Amino acid sequence: MNVTEETVYSGDVKTVQALSSADDNIRYDSKAVFASATIYFEFDKSTLTSKSIQTLKSAVNALNENSSIQITLAGHADERGTREYNLALGQRRAETVSDYFVLNGISKNRITVKSFGEERPAVIGQDEMSYAKNRRVEIN
């Protein structure tokens, strides 16, 4: 099977759109399919920033275009704080993003929420730039 894809970026939201297929027996919906996004947080916070809200608006639009998509929200924290505290903080961050989606019309049934705390850093380092990249929710 040969599928041509176009990757489209809207803010920090990545969508993939199937454009054509060499296999005539398979039909592809031309609607954009949500792929991923990352929402960043301030130190020890689980509130959304204005930049995060813009990213989430784009994600809501992509999810509304294809109502069959299920998403996973994975909450993360930097390494400061105890393991237990960071797991709880990652959970609060993921729940905040979930609440935003639900308030904007995305069914809770389409959303899975989990936390990894500090266990899966995006960046290794002990400086503010590294910490900032690790304070996040990944939407997949």
Predicted regions and their residues:
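Periplasmic peptidoglycan-binding/tethering modules of Gram-negative envelope proteins
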Residues: 1-70
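Periplasmic OmpA-like peptidoglycan-binding domain that tethers envelope proteins to the cell wall
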Residues: 74-140
